[in-house]
Amino acid sequence: MARVCQVTGKAPMVGNNVSHANNKTKRRFLPNLQNRRFWVESENRWVSLRVSNAGLRLIDKKGIDEVLVDLRARGEV
């Protein structure tokens, strides 16, 4: 399973570790992904999503029903 948020599309990005001596080595910044179940009242069922913390805040703001409409329009769920 890819490390991608199903709501926001956040994915790992690449950067550098920088030491005190300014040596640089490649590293990955991973999104803060959580596996969460959401109760969808309109469908009377649970929906499991792999979402980032930013995605959880978006669901709190817009509501799970509106987020699912957007996901289905993109063809993700």
Swiss-Prot record:
GO BP terms: translation
Molecular function terms from GO: structural constituent of ribosome
Keyword list, A-Z: Ribonucleoprotein, Ribosomal protein
One Gene Ontology cellular component annotation held by this UniProt entry: cytosolic large ribosomal subunit
Domain of life: Bacteria
InterPro entries per the UniProt record, alphabetical: Ribosomal_bL28, Ribosomal_bL28/bL31-like_sf, Ribosomal_bL28_bact-type, Ribosomal_bL28_sf
UniProt keyword Ribonucleoprotein, yes or no: yes
NCBIfam families assigned to the protein according to its UniProt record, in alphabetical order: L28 (TIGR00009)
Family per record: Belongs to the bacterial ribosomal protein bL28 family.
Protein name (record): Large ribosomal subunit protein bL28
Organism expressing this protein natively: Ralstonia pickettii (strain 12J)
